[in-house]
């Protein structure tokens, strides 16, 4: 792409008002054209760089997208599966909030050209409309897409580009976290959860929503990848939401183990998961865990921690950057069939302390790194809010 400047020569412009107006219009048009050209060039370069990144890290992505079973009748196919799926993937990469908005944002020759280049479809002249993509996604098997995600994750792990992010040089950190997806006063299906608002009044109503538990792989502090999702299902009116979320987490853990049977994993999550069954599930799968802990999670553990920390006396204060923090920990807390350790961190001058419970061994030399790993789940949740 080459840009050329238009040269305009002016003579006695002060005495020629019509000519002055004409020159102003020409300059304005020139400025707009040059700006559009720069934006077009920037978009094109961004597209080229994106193609390079995808082809370098995920050379098998396009073939895998093309192998997804297409349930559409051949006579009605206008867009290849790879174009439909890649458009949806790019919509997520660029944080576009809806598929309807994607059709608007992507409606440019540059974007169409880039997606055509990415999908190796030179004859692509238009992108599929958002309704076309949604109808296609409803028909395909989600397990096929999950398989692709797992294959991409395996390739990232084999690349050894993120080895420094492992906990204690061995265990991949996976965050488990619940997220709400949309809400409505209309019941979508029998699996959706609901909340009752203004209960017992004339304004009482039910709000229906979907809730999922996600597994997110930590590759770097600013690179956290969602690798698997499990829906929290309505298990009956008497079942509390936290019990539903825990059960969804256990199903998610089974799927993770099946997809990555030999992967050394440390699961991190909030205090909701601090319970006997979670500890046992991790032990059975040969995983470690690092969880936020609150007093109400397991009162007996909190009571023992408060009494033992005075005896073990591991606490110390340390300055880190511009902050000064208080570190403390207690080892060998016996709970049912699990030996636990608990760590505490508090920034000087603040009232709130952060507590973490784990089956990792804790010593003076590794408590700071352990707490930093535990806080990643909290930081991730904060960045999304």
Task: Write out the residue ranges for each language-model feature.
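Active-site-proximal, Lys/Arg-enriched surface segment
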Residues: 134-221
